[in-house]
Amino acid sequence: MSFGQFIALASFVLSMGTIALTYAVGTAEGSAALCNPFFDGCTDITHTGMKGDAGFIFRGGMIAACSFFVIWWMVMRVWLAGSNRIALSVMQFFGVLAALGLLAGTAVLLPEKADTHWGVHVRGANLFFQGMLFALTINYVLIFRARKRGFVVPSFIFKTSLIAVLWFMFIGFAGVTVGVEMSHGKRIIEWWTTLFIGLYFLSSWWDWKGIQLSVNEASGK
């Protein structure tokens, strides 16, 4: 497994694995409603990871995942080093900003609603979804152009499908916005959008197979 593959896999497993484990623990402890949230929308992601052991798992796992998101964007920039430098900088800036927004929004979650800084959480979560969509879109455009120049992208069709679905949900459902209280429809969109973003991170597993990155390359030197 190359360094890049490890980052792609860890980004997906830490994020989606944490959410899955949190939900399992939350339902077992009775702090989260039991359903298929992807279709029923009985709960949002935030409220599955606030109380009890589920809260500790969620905060620890998602904060760790955010750190890997940041590294993922660094690796992606190195991989697309032949692309426009300004576009790469904008892509990385918004990707990292989105990850930091999620980190801040997760860090302020506390077991009791009254103790949680909801303003920080809501802004951080919305920054993640909207900033990440913008960064991933730039990333896809750069990959599309690089591929036309002969750049090999094994996951291109998969990435195309994910970007298309993400934009369909964003436009068709008036964007992905997180609030303290959300409708069933918004909750469903939140679950699916989170999954598709995670899968986009994972898709780089196939692109970065066999690619080894040195410390100097990863830092852009």
Question: What kind of feature is each model-predicted range?
Answer:
Residues 13-35:
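Alpha-helical transmembrane segments of multi-pass membrane proteins
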Residues 139-221:
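Terminal transmembrane helical module of multi-pass membrane proteins
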Residues 58-71, 128-141, 193-207:
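Hydrophobic cores of alpha-helical transmembrane segments in multi-pass inner/ER membrane proteins
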Residues 43-66:
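Interfacial helix-start motif at the membrane-water boundary
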Residues 1-16, 156-160:
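Alpha-helical transmembrane segments and their helix-start/interface "positive-inside/aromatic belt" motifs
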Residues 78-90, 145-156:
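Membrane-interface helix-boundary motifs at transmembrane edges
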Residues 78, 107-115, 172-182:
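Juxtamembrane "helix-exit" motif on the non-cytosolic side of transmembrane helices
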Residues 98-152:
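Membrane-proximal helix-loop-helix units in multi-pass membrane proteins
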